[in-house]
């Protein structure tokens, strides 16, 4: 009999031992990038948001004391797998979270299912673990590539932009962004480019964009590459062509680095600092008080991850050894996060609002990402119902 990762996870879960007693604590493996590279900054922010929530919860999740076991994945799939394996075998973790590097996410999700450890992905989620590829031990409290990009593609189609040029890194996650965007945008593209990872000089790509004379450009980049691309975009005289993308193109790290070139860049995401509801206002104020700096998208994701775990542990009365009960409790969490209403779909992908944000210069001269509107309410991935867990 050949077992797929999904069927293996379901089998292991159904066979998991349960007990009638509660654990005395919950061990959370926090696997992140601490040794440099573009995922180091977001990793620190996810941890800061997670730690803030734990502090507000009195050092507990659902009433259980929390022990956080930290690990450095070095943004390497192989290193990440080794670090995760140590956490499971040596530290006996119950949950792993914190991963930002997409390659590490791909690497440890099947491993977590095999070892019956819940992987709560607090960052961007790929197609490989949702819909008909769902995994009993995999949950995503961050955002999903398809959800955000499909919402943006559908919105831009309503603006009458007939010729959009798309550009992204030539890696699986970059191609997945583009495919999701194209699926709902629908119209023929003005052009499509995949640049080499860690590209520093975009002159050749920008020349192709200029020659195509598009109505707008969709770009996926993150970290230092975002600021680098946007600055060169402006320097190439393309500033009059509207620039769109998912949240990492213009976030709390890339906007200061990009400077005035970032003005006008419009992105789609599931959170922004200026969302007006009380939960977000309290989160933003608490983060500023705790760390002396502004909250970020990544920090909100860490915060929401902790709150989801808190709700699930509370629902099972601390009996986290009952893996099936704990899984069902996670599946049923529903609460008001800083981003707005949050819950999981049947395939454990997030169901949440998607917002349009645009960079402006304030009266004080600061660059700010202002929410323009909600472009999708209670949005999730396509085909979630095909999950057969």
Task: Describe the residue ranges of each PLM region.
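Extracytoplasmic "Venus flytrap"
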Residues: 29-51, 71-78, 100-101, 167-175, ...
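Solvent-exposed, acidic/polar segments of extracytosolic/periplasmic ligand-binding ectodomains
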Residues: 26, 331-389
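Extracytoplasmic ligand/sensor domains, especially the bilobed periplasmic-binding protein
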Residues: 93-193, 242-266
